[in-house]
Amino acid sequence: MSEITYFFEAIQRLKLIFSRSYKLARLGVEGDAHCGKTVQHRSRVAKDPTQPNLRQIHLIHAELHEELNNAGFNVSPGQMGENITTKGIDLLKLPTDTRLHIKEATIQITGLRNPCAQLDNFQSGLMAAVLDKDKNGRLIRKAGIMGIVIAGEVVKTGDSICVELPNPPYRLLEKV
């Protein structure tokens, strides 16, 4: 079964663990620094503040934390900027526009998180650890996926996640 293992909100650009439920609003996680209809990230606002916000919510698979910890890093859920940590879903292999249903909430996947140098500010070498290359030399981004909230609901740690694939042909996730 796939489920939420941890849930976080960003307040003043910090990520905090919570032990209660949080509301997914139609613009993202209620109270989160990235919540909004248009882009919230400073670099994207500087380029064009009217761009739609395709990064309302960030999900990482718990299996990545395990991989990083086995490689010598000390990473806990929420420390890499994610709002939701999942277990049992291969997030990186989901196609664009996949919908994740958590109770009545619906998240539509928009693309891959493009990791940035802030990861190295947290732990040296972490950015390189979440990047890889496939057998053809193409870059693999392992730092999770981004999405938008289609339908809001209060969600909490332990809630089940149902995956709804879009109609084929499927589009591979690209960085957003």
Regions found by a protein language model. Name each.
Residues 137, 164, 175-176:
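Residue-level signal for alpha-helical context at structural boundaries
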Residues 157-161, 168-170:
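Protruding loop/beta-arch "assembly-hinge" segments enriched in small, turn-prone residues
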